[in-house]
Amino acid sequence: MNTSPGTVGSDPVILATAGYDHTVRFWQAHSGICTRTVQHQDSQVNALEVTPDRSMIAAAGYQHIRMYDLNSNNPNPIISYDGVNKNIASVGFHEDGRWMYTGGEDCTARIWDLRSRNLQCQRIFQVNAPINCVCLHPNQAELIVGDQSGAIHIWDLKTDHNEQLIPEPEVSITSAHIDPDASYMAAVNSTGNCYVWNLTGGIGDEVTQLIPKTKIPAHTRYALQCRFSPDSTLLATCSADQTCKIWRTSNFSLMTELSIKSGNPGESSRGWMWGCAFSGDSQYIVTASSDNLARLWCVETGEIKREYGGHQKAVVCLAFNDSVLG
């Protein structure tokens, strides 16, 4: 892989943050130093994801997708696409980088061919409500789509069939995730509840079956994201209640609560905890919040190890990749 020394792509750890100040910032994770800032002029950034080969980062915003080069300091996007209506809320990649998926407020999830330099939309999955989240099953053959009507759709990419679940009617699904072992699926919603299912099937031609496992009253306010750890032992949930909570998947008990609440009774709210990402060894987690900061926490102790300051407005999304390619 051709990475120039001193570029983001040459660093074994890629940490990027973005949000409402129209910039994407790249950080040296261990020092907290901002190493590169990309101006993302057209809109806020709703979602960020690094390509599997660590060569590019996708930034999804209002009516567009921009992809920036990680192996050079080129300030301009190397791939741009503007043909989607409304906000794009979610973005991710097939594990070998052949295609990208997105979901957004135009009520569609889309698959994009990445093998040519101009993004080609290959397939569209239409639902009846704006889409908040899309995640890919580890089998790379099913997309989980969560929408604002409270539905979770399982779109089988091989057969084009889809199944639908509605844990709470008319309560918006804000995030869904499947753990790397494909043992569990979690989804959080706008009332703060987290639902967990056991997964079976999903191998070969078998369709994934979801068996309800538990409902966690995770937060008292809007939940914004849920993420399993790479070792599948933990589940993190982020919320408008200023916390990120970490749950053990062995029994879904609370292990650690990470809070940005002020100890000062007179101080107003520091805002929402928008998103999170675990480190590859599952020992650390980075959070993004609307007090303009990202933070690196020790999962076990809940201690803040580093703060990443520089954004002028809320940080609502991040990408964290510390897996070194062999």
Swiss-Prot record:
PTM summary: Phosphorylation at Thr-51 by CDK1 promotes ubiquitination by the SCF(FBXW7) complex, followed by degradation.
Record-stated family: Belongs to the WD repeat LST8 family.
Name assigned to this protein: Target of rapamycin complex subunit LST8
Organism classification: Eukaryota, Metazoa, Chordata, Craniata, Vertebrata
UniProt subcellular location: Lysosome membrane; Cytoplasm
Effect annotated for changing K313R: Elevated assembly of mTORC2 complex. Decreased sumoylation
GO CC aspect terms: cytoplasm; cytosol; lysosomal membrane; nucleoplasm; serine/threonine protein kinase complex; TORC1 complex; TORC2 complex
Keywords: Acetylation, Cytoplasm, Isopeptide bond, Lysosome, Membrane, Phosphoprotein, Repeat, Ubl conjugation, WD repeat
Gene that this polypeptide is encoded by: MLST8
